[in-house]
């Protein structure tokens, strides 16, 4: 039994090593494609939020309006390319004749690209970390709409890059005081009190309605 387990481990490890070597080329290809496409667009704002937000809801309409106004100011709009908040933001961009970018991710349960992305600005990714580089590298600001784990991941990614000075400080807005207030309370009452962040870290972003 032990010999069988050892054999399986060794086989799995060798197969994993071989697969990892080929993955490098796929990762490099995603970086190159992303850099080439996004470097041509100009100043952009990334808008993050839930894929589950339905048309006709307050935050869907608000996302559409925010994207439309930012587009009218000359910014390209980058989203995750899926439904919900992402669709709303891309839709608002198209209505303003702006540059509508979608960074779609291949997932087992979602998501197909929404219908409001410029055809030459739709990129598909297998790797979340490559996709996040594209969001952050080419954005001059960030809008965080209500969302789930993915949105929180993106929020903490950006705020960490700014806090650690890997990024210059730039506007980061959390939209929806009622939605975000619980998180802010935790940051203030737990993380700050425990000494794990500094008071100035809480000034890296702003909450609005």
Indicate residue ranges for each PLM-predicted region.
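Glycine-rich beta-alpha loop segments
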Residues: 10-103
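Residue-level signal for short, function-critical loop segments
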Residues: 51-53, 147-148, 178
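Glycine-rich, charge-decorated loop segments at or immediately adjacent to ligand/cofactor-binding or catalytic sites
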Residues: 84-91, 180-192
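Acidic/glycine-enriched connector segments
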Residues: 84-144
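Short, acidic/small-residue loops that bind anionic groups at enzyme active sites
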Residues: 99-110, 145, 159-186, 199-200
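Short, conserved catalytic or adaptor-binding loops enriched in Gly and charged residues
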Residues: 114-117, 194-201
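Active-site/ligand-binding-proximal alpha/beta "capping" segment
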Residues: 126-175
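A charged, well-structured terminal subsegment
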Residues: 137, 141, 198-209
């Amino acid at each position: 039994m032990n010999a069988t387990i050892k054999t399986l481990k060794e086989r799995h490890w060798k197969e994993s090593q071989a697969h990892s070597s080929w993955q490098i080329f796929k990762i490099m290809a995603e970086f190159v494609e992303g850099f080439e496409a996004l470097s041509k667009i100009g100043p952009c704002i990334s808008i993050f939020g839930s894929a589950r937000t339905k048309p006709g809801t307050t935050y869907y309409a608000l996302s559409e309006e925010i994207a439309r106004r930012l587009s009218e100011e000359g910014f390209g709009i980058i989203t995750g390319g899926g439904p919900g908040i992402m669709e709303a933001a891309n839709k608002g961009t198209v209505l303003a004749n702006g540059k509508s970018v979608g960074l779609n991710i291949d997932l087992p349960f979602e998501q197909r690209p929404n219908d409001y992305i410029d055809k030459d600005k739709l990129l598909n990714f297998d790797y979340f970390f490559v996709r996040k580089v594209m969001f952050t590298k080419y954005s001059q600001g960030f809008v965080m709409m209500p969302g789930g784990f993915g949105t929180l991941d993106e929020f903490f990614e950006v705020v960490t890059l700014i806090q650690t000075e890997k990024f210059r400080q730039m506007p980061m807005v959390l939209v929806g005081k009622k939605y975000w207030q619980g998180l802010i309370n935790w940051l203030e009452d737990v993380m700050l009190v425990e000494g794990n962040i500094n008071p100035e870290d809480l000034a890296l972003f702003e909450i609005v309605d």
